[in-house]
Each structure stands twice: as structure tokens, then as C-alpha cells.
Amino acid sequence: VTGTRNETDIRHLPMTISIVNRQQIEKRYEPSLLPLLTEQVPGLFTTSRGIMGYGVSTGAAGGMSLRGIGGSPTAGLLVLIDGHPQYMGLMGHPIADAYQSMLAERVEVLRGPASVLYGSNAMGGVINIVTRKQQEEGVKNNMQVGYGSYNTLQTEFSNRVKKGCFSSVVTGSYNRTDGHRSDMEFEQYGGYAKLGYDLSTFWKVWEDIN
């Protein structure tokens, strides 16, 4: 999907694509997607601000790069959620802290230039986060909580609902740490919500906020 903008067998694509599925995501118990992607995707590197978190400024903030293209703040590496570009206002670069594991069904990473399809922000490649969906009727809830050294707390939850033609996904996270030295405190709130309605077998409408 990321390489052609329509559904295509990955074996028929002329570019290099890595896919990280839900099973791989769940095995890591990481609140952020980026450490997992760094391990699973060749050529993708991320740097954090400290013990956790990435920030959005230059200097102390972290960044993402793919095949050497990116930096701090991240430029030349496009991040999509369900195919929609993610920019931080006038800064024009993605917000690394917003990409949480609970919202992702799978992640597709196109490694290499993709500016013909996606514009100049995709010089290094494209990361497309495909969000989770509730396939069967009913309600599903998930929650993960972790606590460790330096008063570090990591929490995530998700709620997925499907009733008839209506479906919804809501995820949230709260992470904090005191850090291993003074002035290293970090606190982060995150959330994602998506509402959808099936008009027919082939037509669906949805709205989301991150």
C-alpha cells in the first residue's frame, strides 16, 4: 500500500519495503513504536531525548533517519497514519512521541526515495502506521503498565468497538520518569481516537484525531 497507494502484493513492488506486524509489536511491550522499528527495519535509526521521549526541537531533541537521511528535527523522512501525512504545524516535521504501539496494527516502511509519490518530505523514505480495527462484533479492551528504575512509569490502554456498521478505536498513554540525574525529568500524555461507519462493502467513512 505504501509503495503504490493501492493494494499490491509486496513481491511485485520495485522498491524495498519492510513490514512490522501486530504480533511483533506485542512481543516488545514498548509504549513507543520507534525502538521496535529501529530493531526490525534495516537502515532506520532513532535517537531519544533521554531515558524516554523524543521532543520536537533541535539540539537536545531526538530524531529519526532512514539510510542516512533525516536528522533533528526529522526532515526528509515522511510519517503517515493510515496514509495521511503527520506534520507538527509550521515546523513541518513529524512528532516522534505521538507514535504509540497501542494504535498500530502494522507498520509499513518504504526504504529509499519516494518523492514522486509523496513529495520532498519523503527523500529518505516513508513510515506508514496502519491503525487497528475491530473486525468482529463487540468490545475489546487492552492495558499495559510498567514500572522501573528512576520512578519510571509507562502505561497504555486501548478500547475497540464494533456494532453493526459503526466502529471506533480509542487509545491513550501516560509515560513519566525522574531520570538518572537531575533535570532529566520527562512526562508525556498521548491519545488517539478514530470513528468509522461502513456505508457499504466498498465504501467507508472515518474521522480520527491524534
Regions from the PLM with identified roles:
Residues 1-26, 34:
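Short, acidic, small-residue-rich periplasmic hinge/interaction motif at the N-terminus
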Residues 4, 51, 112, 130, ...:
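Outer-membrane beta-barrel pore domains and translocons
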Residues 17, 25, 37-38, 107-109, ...:
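Non-catalytic regulatory/gating segments with a bias toward low-complexity or hydrophobic composition
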Residues 35-84, 105:
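Extracytoplasmic beta-strand/coil segments of soluble accessory domains associated
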Residues 63-65, 106, 126, 140-144, ...:
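Membrane-embedded beta-strand positions in outer-membrane beta-barrel channels/transporters
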Residues 84-111:
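Short acidic/polar hinge/loop motifs at secondary-structure boundaries
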Residues 105-106, 125, 131-147, 167-172:
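Transmembrane beta-strand segments of Gram-negative outer membrane beta-barrel proteins
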Residues 147-176, 181-210:
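Transmembrane beta-barrel wall of Gram-negative outer-membrane proteins
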